[in-house]
Amino acid sequence: MTTDTIVAQATAPGRGGVGIIRVSGKLASDVAHTLLGHLPKPRYADFCDFKAADGSVIDQGIALFFKGPNSFTGEDVLELQGHGGQVVMDMLIRAVLKVKGVRIARPGEFSEQAFMNDKLDLTQAEAIADLIDATSEQAAKSALHSLQGEFSTQVHTLVDKITNLRLYVEAAIDFPDEEVDFLSDGKIAAALYAIIDQLDEVQASAKQGSIIREGMKVVIAGRPNAGKSSLLNALAGKESAIVTDIAGTTRDVLREHIHLDGMPLHIIDTAGLRDTTDEVERIGIERAWSEIASADRVLFMVDGTDTAAVDPHEIWPDFIDRLPKAMGVTVVRNKADLTGEPLEATEEQGYSVYRISAKTGLGVDALKQHLKSLMGYQSNLEGGFIARRRHLEALEQASEHLQLGKVQLEVYLAGELLAEELRMAQQALSEITGEFTSDDLLGKIFSSFCIGK
């Protein structure tokens, strides 16, 4: 951990009513004496002049001093809140750097110091960047929940339960004559199943939090001339794709990035799926299947004039059978303006079914609301936390180890192997909060932050 004293502008560069310079480290008090002529009373606002080394006044404003460990970074912190002109900010930073031993902060270094000094765990530190980068009110609220420790608390609860179970199993190993009875009495199995169920719930919430942060990938798929490109245009609100009556017009993947009430949505229009001898169209169809395989949701576009069926297994069983097992599918019956069917949403055989006219826009707003709900949009903004892809990967690793541990318990009654799988699951979860994390990962995370944060 560095013992350097660091300085950076904490507010965004450019013109503004207020600009803030932040200093953190053991030399923060020396900086105060140099620029202010005194050390402000800790945690009290002090209106004073900010002076250069020659005594000339650079600016005047509010000085705040926080004595470590009672500060954001856990170190002594000085904040100078002056006028927001960039020239003034640069002059103040140069004056601070004249104090020997002070250097410019790296991106995210203030948050990194807070993490190193146990003021924040890693998910809370990441939540600061996510709160700053939030593109919707929902994302901001979820990031704030993570900053307040909601995600961390759930992870810590799981780690504690896994640790206690592991100790219980290891106690059984220490008494080999009783180990088999100990492992087969049902108590360990019940505790393990409860942990697996709880982890499943956290995984579901984390996946929703990841969608709120990164957006949901929605692929529009179906047979040629079902109206896929028309739906892309309707959702995007512009003519992104060429629309004709000729089957196979779309031969490549088309992408649009839109926001629904600020929530990011990545829409992919694909080539119509069919057998073809046209080489270019065939390549487009292969790309379509590749996009479908990595989608968060598939909009199965159906030409309502071709069939009255609503069950996708009845409409096109081969298509549904080829989809990844856990893929979410929404059936979109298009051309309701021609079929005259009511513009209603129904649930059929576990699938959401929407009736629309991509050409006229009828029913498209209801489909947008459906997509918003899938992304976790909540009008009351209650609950939920933000999550990153690395969090999902760590949760999946923990889940895999718990499932392997379940096999060791149920099939082999192997206490040592169960204990090892529990240890690996515990380690995977601890990577989320930073209790077990490599320096390379820390560097990658904090380097993506703003300077001054």
From Swiss-Prot:
Residues given in the record as GTP binding sites: 225-230, 244-250, 269-272, 334-337
Pfam family, one: TrmE_N
EC id: 3.6.-.-
Single Gene Ontology MF annotation: GTP binding
UniProt: K(+) binding residues: 225, 244, 246, 249
Family the UniProt entry places it in: Belongs to the TRAFAC class TrmE-Era-EngA-EngB-Septin-like GTPase superfamily. TrmE GTPase family.
Protein's name according to its UniProt entry: tRNA modification GTPase MnmE
Organism of provenance: Shewanella amazonensis (strain ATCC BAA-1098 / SB2B)
